[in-house]
Amino acid sequence: MATVNKQAIAAAFGRAAAHYEQHADLQRQSADALLAMLPQRKYTHVLDAGCGPGWMSRHWRERHAQVTALDLSPPMLVQARQKDAADHYLAGDIESLPLATATFDLAWSNLAVQWCGNLSTALRELYRVVRPKGVVAFTTLVQGSLPELHQAWQAVDERPHANRFLPPDEIEQSLNGVHYQHHIQPITLWFDDALSAMRSLKGIGATHLHEGRDPRILTRSQLQRLQLAWPQQQGRYPLTYHLFLGVIARE
Protein backbone atom coordinates (compact mmCIF):
# COMPACT_ATOMS: atom_id res chain seq x y z
CA MET A 1 0.00 0.00 0.00
CA ALA A 2 1.15 3.54 -0.71
CA THR A 3 1.76 5.86 2.22
CA VAL A 4 -1.35 7.98 2.57
CA ASN A 5 -1.40 11.59 3.80
CA LYS A 6 -4.93 11.86 5.19
CA GLN A 7 -4.65 15.61 5.81
CA ALA A 8 -3.70 16.21 2.17
CA ILE A 9 -6.60 14.06 0.97
CA ALA A 10 -9.05 15.90 3.24
CA ALA A 11 -7.69 19.23 1.97
CA ALA A 12 -8.07 18.19 -1.69
CA PHE A 13 -11.69 17.19 -1.17
CA GLY A 14 -12.31 20.25 0.97
CA ARG A 15 -11.22 22.50 -1.91
CA ALA A 16 -13.65 20.66 -4.20
CA ALA A 17 -16.57 20.60 -1.76
CA ALA A 18 -18.55 23.59 -3.04
CA HIS A 19 -18.54 22.38 -6.67
CA TYR A 20 -18.36 18.62 -6.12
CA GLU A 21 -21.89 17.66 -7.14
CA GLN A 22 -21.72 19.30 -10.56
CA HIS A 23 -18.73 17.07 -11.39
CA ALA A 24 -20.05 13.92 -9.73
CA ASP A 25 -21.34 11.93 -12.72
CA LEU A 26 -19.02 9.04 -11.86
CA GLN A 27 -20.25 8.92 -8.26
CA ARG A 28 -23.88 8.89 -9.36
CA GLN A 29 -23.39 6.11 -11.90
CA SER A 30 -21.35 4.11 -9.41
CA ALA A 31 -24.02 4.52 -6.72
CA ASP A 32 -26.76 3.39 -9.10
CA ALA A 33 -24.77 0.25 -9.97
CA LEU A 34 -24.17 -0.54 -6.30
CA LEU A 35 -27.83 0.03 -5.41
CA ALA A 36 -28.75 -2.57 -8.04
CA MET A 37 -26.61 -5.13 -6.18
CA LEU A 38 -28.05 -4.47 -2.71
CA PRO A 39 -30.48 -6.93 -1.10
CA GLN A 40 -33.91 -5.34 -1.46
CA ARG A 41 -35.06 -4.71 2.09
CA LYS A 42 -35.58 -1.82 4.49
CA TYR A 43 -32.44 -0.37 6.07
CA THR A 44 -33.31 1.54 9.24
CA HIS A 45 -29.83 2.68 10.34
CA VAL A 46 -27.35 3.62 7.60
CA LEU A 47 -23.74 4.79 7.71
CA ASP A 48 -22.65 6.77 4.63
CA ALA A 49 -18.86 6.44 4.94
CA GLY A 50 -17.11 8.99 2.76
CA CYS A 51 -20.38 10.85 2.29
CA GLY A 52 -19.01 13.81 0.32
CA PRO A 53 -21.68 16.52 0.04
CA GLY A 54 -24.37 14.09 1.19
CA TRP A 55 -26.13 13.07 -2.01
CA MET A 56 -26.48 9.40 -0.98
CA SER A 57 -27.08 10.30 2.66
CA ARG A 58 -30.13 12.19 1.44
CA HIS A 59 -31.16 9.17 -0.67
CA TRP A 60 -31.26 6.94 2.41
CA ARG A 61 -32.88 9.57 4.61
CA GLU A 62 -35.69 10.00 2.07
CA ARG A 63 -36.30 6.27 2.51
CA HIS A 64 -36.86 6.82 6.23
CA ALA A 65 -33.49 5.56 7.47
CA GLN A 66 -31.60 7.14 10.36
CA VAL A 67 -28.43 8.26 8.57
CA THR A 68 -24.96 9.00 9.89
CA ALA A 69 -22.86 10.92 7.35
CA LEU A 70 -19.11 10.47 7.86
CA ASP A 71 -16.32 12.13 5.92
CA LEU A 72 -12.63 12.90 6.33
CA SER A 73 -13.22 16.42 4.97
CA PRO A 74 -15.02 18.93 7.25
CA PRO A 75 -16.01 21.16 4.27
CA MET A 76 -17.79 18.17 2.71
CA LEU A 77 -19.73 17.71 5.94
CA VAL A 78 -20.66 21.41 5.84
CA GLN A 79 -22.15 20.85 2.37
CA ALA A 80 -24.04 17.76 3.59
CA ARG A 81 -25.38 19.62 6.62
CA GLN A 82 -26.54 22.55 4.46
CA LYS A 83 -28.60 20.06 2.44
CA ASP A 84 -30.02 18.51 5.64
CA ALA A 85 -28.80 15.23 4.18
CA ALA A 86 -28.42 13.16 7.36
CA ASP A 87 -29.43 12.85 10.98
CA HIS A 88 -25.87 12.85 12.32
CA TYR A 89 -22.62 14.27 10.89
CA LEU A 90 -19.23 12.94 11.86
CA ALA A 91 -15.69 13.89 10.82
CA GLY A 92 -13.72 10.67 10.81
CA ASP A 93 -11.49 8.15 9.10
CA ILE A 94 -12.94 4.94 7.65
CA GLU A 95 -9.85 3.05 8.85
CA SER A 96 -10.61 4.04 12.46
CA LEU A 97 -14.33 4.65 12.74
CA PRO A 98 -15.35 6.57 15.88
CA LEU A 99 -18.48 4.41 16.13
CA ALA A 100 -19.74 1.56 18.29
CA THR A 101 -19.69 -2.02 17.07
CA ALA A 102 -22.89 -3.45 15.51
CA THR A 103 -24.65 -0.09 15.09
CA PHE A 104 -25.96 -0.09 11.49
CA ASP A 105 -28.05 -2.24 9.15
CA LEU A 106 -26.04 -0.89 6.22
CA ALA A 107 -22.55 0.56 5.92
CA TRP A 108 -22.47 2.27 2.52
CA SER A 109 -19.24 3.59 1.02
CA ASN A 110 -19.24 4.81 -2.58
CA LEU A 111 -15.83 5.59 -4.09
CA ALA A 112 -14.09 6.40 -0.82
CA VAL A 113 -12.00 3.40 0.27
CA GLN A 114 -9.49 3.89 -2.59
CA TRP A 115 -8.15 6.79 -0.50
CA CYS A 116 -7.46 4.55 2.49
CA GLY A 117 -3.95 3.44 3.38
CA ASN A 118 -5.02 -0.16 3.98
CA LEU A 119 -8.14 -1.52 2.31
CA SER A 120 -8.35 -4.54 4.62
CA THR A 121 -8.44 -2.25 7.66
CA ALA A 122 -11.14 -0.07 6.10
CA LEU A 123 -13.35 -3.03 5.22
CA ARG A 124 -12.87 -4.59 8.66
CA GLU A 125 -14.01 -1.35 10.26
CA LEU A 126 -17.10 -1.11 8.04
CA TYR A 127 -17.86 -4.76 8.85
CA ARG A 128 -17.39 -4.12 12.57
CA VAL A 129 -20.00 -1.37 12.79
CA VAL A 130 -22.65 -3.41 10.95
CA ARG A 131 -25.10 -5.54 12.91
CA PRO A 132 -25.45 -9.30 12.36
CA LYS A 133 -27.46 -9.88 9.16
CA GLY A 134 -26.49 -6.39 8.05
CA VAL A 135 -24.68 -5.38 4.86
CA VAL A 136 -21.50 -3.57 3.84
CA ALA A 137 -21.78 -2.12 0.33
CA PHE A 138 -18.78 -0.43 -1.25
CA THR A 139 -17.25 0.65 -4.52
CA THR A 140 -13.65 1.40 -5.31
CA LEU A 141 -11.46 1.91 -8.37
CA VAL A 142 -9.26 -0.85 -9.73
CA GLN A 143 -6.05 -1.08 -11.68
CA GLY A 144 -6.49 0.02 -15.29
CA SER A 145 -8.61 3.07 -14.49
CA LEU A 146 -7.90 6.35 -16.33
CA PRO A 147 -5.94 4.79 -19.22
CA GLU A 148 -6.56 7.83 -21.43
CA LEU A 149 -5.03 10.14 -18.83
CA HIS A 150 -1.96 7.94 -18.45
CA GLN A 151 -1.55 7.66 -22.23
CA ALA A 152 -1.82 11.40 -22.79
CA TRP A 153 0.65 12.30 -20.03
CA GLN A 154 3.25 9.93 -21.49
CA ALA A 155 3.54 12.42 -24.34
CA VAL A 156 4.51 15.13 -21.84
CA ASP A 157 6.55 13.58 -19.04
CA GLU A 158 7.12 10.36 -17.14
CA ARG A 159 5.71 11.46 -13.78
CA PRO A 160 2.54 9.87 -12.38
CA HIS A 161 -0.48 12.15 -12.70
CA ALA A 162 -3.07 9.80 -11.23
CA ASN A 163 -2.92 7.26 -8.45
CA ARG A 164 -2.38 3.60 -9.23
CA PHE A 165 -5.25 1.52 -7.96
CA LEU A 166 -5.24 -2.03 -6.63
CA PRO A 167 -5.75 -4.99 -8.99
CA PRO A 168 -8.99 -6.94 -8.43
CA ASP A 169 -7.23 -9.95 -6.90
CA GLU A 170 -5.70 -7.78 -4.16
CA ILE A 171 -9.11 -6.32 -3.38
CA GLU A 172 -10.53 -9.84 -3.13
CA GLN A 173 -7.70 -10.79 -0.76
CA SER A 174 -8.97 -8.01 1.52
CA LEU A 175 -12.32 -9.81 1.58
CA ASN A 176 -10.96 -13.16 2.80
CA GLY A 177 -13.11 -14.70 5.49
CA VAL A 178 -16.38 -12.90 4.71
CA HIS A 179 -19.35 -13.74 2.50
CA TYR A 180 -19.46 -11.32 -0.40
CA GLN A 181 -20.55 -10.75 -3.96
CA HIS A 182 -18.66 -8.54 -6.36
CA HIS A 183 -18.81 -7.16 -9.85
CA ILE A 184 -16.34 -5.21 -11.99
CA GLN A 185 -17.81 -2.59 -14.27
CA PRO A 186 -16.29 0.03 -16.58
CA ILE A 187 -17.75 3.53 -16.68
CA THR A 188 -16.67 5.96 -19.40
CA LEU A 189 -17.33 9.69 -19.17
CA TRP A 190 -17.09 11.91 -22.26
CA PHE A 191 -15.73 15.44 -22.56
CA ASP A 192 -15.32 18.14 -25.20
CA ASP A 193 -11.55 18.41 -24.67
CA ALA A 194 -8.70 17.04 -22.59
CA LEU A 195 -8.71 20.00 -20.21
CA SER A 196 -12.38 19.39 -19.33
CA ALA A 197 -11.57 15.74 -18.62
CA MET A 198 -8.76 16.73 -16.26
CA ARG A 199 -10.90 19.40 -14.61
CA SER A 200 -13.47 16.72 -13.81
CA LEU A 201 -10.85 14.99 -11.67
CA LYS A 202 -10.03 18.22 -9.86
CA GLY A 203 -13.72 18.97 -9.48
CA ILE A 204 -14.26 15.82 -7.42
CA GLY A 205 -11.10 16.30 -5.37
CA ALA A 206 -9.37 13.35 -7.01
CA THR A 207 -6.15 15.12 -7.95
CA HIS A 208 -4.31 14.27 -4.72
CA LEU A 209 -1.37 11.95 -5.45
CA HIS A 210 -0.04 9.65 -2.74
CA GLU A 211 3.48 10.06 -4.19
CA GLY A 212 3.25 13.85 -4.14
CA ARG A 213 2.43 16.34 -6.83
CA ASP A 214 4.55 18.25 -9.31
CA PRO A 215 3.89 21.91 -8.38
CA ARG A 216 4.61 23.20 -11.89
CA ILE A 217 1.70 24.73 -13.80
CA LEU A 218 0.67 23.10 -17.07
CA THR A 219 2.01 25.15 -19.99
CA ARG A 220 0.13 25.87 -23.20
CA SER A 221 2.46 23.61 -25.20
CA GLN A 222 2.02 20.77 -22.69
CA LEU A 223 -1.74 21.14 -22.92
CA GLN A 224 -1.55 20.99 -26.72
CA ARG A 225 0.51 17.78 -26.50
CA LEU A 226 -1.99 16.31 -24.05
CA GLN A 227 -4.85 17.20 -26.33
CA LEU A 228 -3.17 15.54 -29.32
CA ALA A 229 -2.12 12.43 -27.38
CA TRP A 230 -5.49 11.87 -25.71
CA PRO A 231 -7.37 9.06 -27.52
CA GLN A 232 -10.49 10.45 -29.17
CA GLN A 233 -13.68 9.05 -30.62
CA GLN A 234 -15.70 11.23 -32.99
CA GLY A 235 -14.10 14.36 -31.58
CA ARG A 236 -14.93 13.48 -27.96
CA TYR A 237 -12.47 12.77 -25.16
CA PRO A 238 -13.16 9.68 -23.01
CA LEU A 239 -12.11 9.08 -19.42
CA THR A 240 -12.62 5.47 -18.32
CA TYR A 241 -12.90 4.15 -14.79
CA HIS A 242 -12.98 0.49 -13.76
CA LEU A 243 -15.15 -0.04 -10.70
CA PHE A 244 -15.07 -2.85 -8.16
CA LEU A 245 -18.51 -3.14 -6.57
CA GLY A 246 -18.72 -5.30 -3.46
CA VAL A 247 -21.55 -6.35 -1.14
CA ILE A 248 -20.60 -8.11 2.10
CA ALA A 249 -23.17 -10.01 4.18
CA ARG A 250 -22.49 -9.73 7.92
CA GLU A 251 -22.97 -13.03 9.74
UniProtKB/Swiss-Prot annotation:
This protein's record includes keyword Disulfide bond: no
Pathway assigned to this chain's UniProt record: Cofactor biosynthesis; biotin biosynthesis
Database matches in SUPFAM superfamilies: S-adenosyl-L-methionine-dependent methyltransferases
Originating organism: Escherichia coli (strain K12)
Hydrolase recorded as keyword: no
Protein name (database record): Malonyl-[acyl-carrier protein] O-methyltransferase
Any one biological process term the GO annotation gives: biotin biosynthetic process
Enzyme class at the top of the EC tree: transferase
Family: Belongs to the methyltransferase superfamily.
Pfam families the record matches: Methyltransf_11
Catalytic activity of the protein: malonyl-[ACP] + S-adenosyl-L-methionine = malonyl-[ACP] methyl ester + S-adenosyl-L-homocysteine
MF terms in GO: carboxyl-O-methyltransferase activity; malonyl-CoA methyltransferase activity; methyltransferase activity; S-adenosylmethionine-dependent methyltransferase activity
Organism classification: Bacteria, Pseudomonadati, Pseudomonadota, Gammaproteobacteria, Enterobacterales
CDD domains in alphabetical order: AdoMet_MTases
EC number: 2.1.1.197
